[in-house]
Amino acid sequence: GHAKGDKKVSKK
């Protein structure tokens, strides 16, 4: 999770 997961997980 970096680009697409960034909106739900801000820690990564």
From Swiss-Prot:
GO molecular function, one term: rRNA binding
The entry's keywords: Ribonucleoprotein, Ribosomal protein, RNA-binding, rRNA-binding
GO CC terms: ribonucleoprotein complex; ribosome
Keyword Plastid: no
Keyword check for Phosphoprotein: no
Record function comment: Protein S19 forms a complex with S13 that binds strongly to the 16S ribosomal RNA.
Family: Belongs to the universal ribosomal protein uS19 family.
Name of the molecule in the record: Small ribosomal subunit protein uS19
